[in-house]
């Protein structure tokens, strides 16, 4: 489906890391907060845990549980998508764009936001702003485009 991605992966130019969605969000949030790492049970005993530090901690009931160390993400560049921005970089997200754009923006040294509309400073209702302009270094007014995805592939469920 993506021949260039396939070529880079097979030639060793590109690495793939498996990371559960919630763990990815927390890794970005941790990086944005300056937290170098955290322990989680998510992924223990799976491919996700291979090569990572394991440590046992007691749970709430005192039962020892194995956790894996996940490192915070500290990016050089974060590229995010927002619905609307004002001239000072305050952003408003819509729908599912509210999920990962905020932690993605904060974990990058430089944040570039592509937006659908730029309004004058002071035009956005402060109660509607999702990300303060202090986290945004550049705003790019995007052109309308069709959102294209690769072919959806799902695994059939086994029947009992």
Task: Cite the ranges covered by each PLM segment.
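Conserved alpha/beta enzyme-core scaffold
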Residues: 1-160
């Amino acid at each position: 489906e993506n021949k260039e991605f396939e070529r880079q992966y097979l030639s060793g130019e590109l690495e793939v890391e498996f990371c559960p969605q919630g763990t990815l969000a927390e890794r970005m949030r941790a990086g944005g907060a300056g937290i170098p790492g955290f322990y989680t049970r998510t992924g223990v005993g799976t491919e996700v845990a291979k090569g990572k530090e394991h440590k046992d901690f007691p749970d709430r009931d005192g039962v020892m549980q194995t956790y894996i160390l996940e490192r915070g993400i500290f990016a050089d560049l974060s590229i995010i998508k927002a619905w609307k921005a004002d001239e000072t970089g305050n952003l408003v997200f819509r729908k599912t764009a509210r999920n990962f754009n905020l932690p993605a923006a904060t974990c990058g040294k430089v944040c570039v936001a592509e937006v659908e509309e730029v309004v004058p400073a002071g035009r956005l209702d402060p109660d509607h702003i999702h990300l303060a302009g202090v986290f945004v270094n550049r705003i790019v007014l995007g052109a309308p485009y069709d959102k294209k995805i690769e072919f959806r592939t799902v695994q059939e469920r086994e029947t009992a």
